[in-house]
Swiss-Prot record:
Gene name, Swiss-Prot/TrEMBL: aglA
Protein name (record): Probable alpha-galactosidase A
Lineage, highest ranks first: Eukaryota, Fungi, Dikarya, Ascomycota, Pezizomycotina
Glycosylated residues in this chain: N43, N81, N117, N197
Annotated PANTHER family: ALPHA-GALACTOSIDASE A-RELATED, ALPHA-GALACTOSIDASE/ALPHA-N-ACETYLGALACTOSAMINIDASE
Documented EC number(s): 3.2.1.22
Amino acid sequence: MHPSMTLLAILPPLVRASIGNPHLLPTPPMGFNNWARFMCNLNESLFLDTAAAMLDTGLHAAGYTRLNLDDCWMASHRAPNGSLPWDPTKFPHSLPWLSAQLRSLGFSLGIYQDAGNVTCGGYPGSYGFEELDAHTFAEWGVDYLKLDGCNVSPAGAVSLADEYRARYARWHSVLGAMPHPLVFSESAPAYFVDPQNATAWYGVMDWVPAYGELARHSTDILVYEGEGSAWQSIMVNYRYNTLLARYQRPGYFNDPDFLIADHPGLSLVEKRSHFALWASFGAPLIISADVPGLSKEVIAVLTNADLIRVDQDALGLQATLASRSEHLDVLTRSLDGGDRLVTILNRGDGGLAVKVPVGWMGLQRCAYQAKNLWDGEIQEIEEDIEVQLDSHATEVFRVSLPPDCPMVIPTGIVFNTASGNCLTDGEALAFEPCRGQDLQVWQVEESGILRPLSRTSHCLTAIGDNVVVKPCTGRPGQRWTYHITGNLQNQHTGACLTEGTGIDVCGFELDSQVFGLPSGVDIEA
């Protein structure tokens, strides 16, 4: 075996849903969680009032049916038999009673626990009580578990990453043995985020999809009374999510955290962008807000049927970056039935006039219809979509493909997830800051051939220790394989694309060798 293939061969199997059953959660969850808005100030009345408001405002009818408790719901100590009681002051009628009440209204109850011996809020954790807690929750009528990762300490020579994996694997095993497994939301990756080196983070991300249905992968979104910019918090989690598209598919979803729909630091434009981006990602839509107090304008955003349809699309793909420049992101993905999603975000502080060519969408010149998913307006396009974007605004289009138009080719930037630099065609192939140019947009064919949009007669080619762009001839070195690890491996040489050296022996989740590619590209173990 080629030395560069050895590390890839020992990686975890290709992403699969928890319990081996993608039907447990075929589409992202939608609902409510108290944490970002109320933190530990949760109680029975909050959840009943939230349920009533969701029924009255149309949120329930739109699909928001999960009401999830977060930390601090439990008593301060376990019972003598080891079981975990609820706080009787916060939940005087009991959690089984609350679960039954919510179920009678058409909702389901989710719950929070922690993989350590103590939760983040200082309450009893699940370590050593996994099976007892799982069956207790099921007896209460709970069908969704968010497992946090505070206070996890390895013993002896065990690494921290291995300890997390063992504890989440234990929960996976317990849930898998139950007649009706709970949906399993894993927070393990969030404890390995390191802006200086992502190797450990990706190492955890490689296994979480095998154990659960969704993962809280990075920093917590800003809470209601937190300090700092709510918009910047959204953008931080947005960025992390763009690095992880390769993991997502039906049955497993990347979770960039809650929709903070009533945060006082957000304008309505920013709230619209928050929702549109999460829907474009196919991310969980979990509202953390004072739902009875939401304005009609915000309710209209959260119940946008066209965007919810995108979020719940059966293909389960995540939108990826087709193009990026200093202030502008264009994301695309394919939808069930053949339509193409185009999402355009202005990250800058001023307005932008934007033209998005059909080539960036993975299309060729033809007659298409593009529906604006905010106002429903349909426009005929052949060459591009033109749009005016206010600061921090996001427009979303659903492009219908007539049967006589060419098929979609996955198209977008090939970017290093650590540096953010784009693979750039030119006299000398290089990684450069992304500038929103065809030189940095690549078509990725099913055969493994990559062509720059600037000259589609040429292909990314490995020659010896170098990687260049040469005329496409079918020569050895012009076919590549994209791995779940983010490695782009040449099928002829066995080496991996590497920022800084061009191509090199494949390592394990090295920052220089992990790349984001367009949505829809085939992914190998």
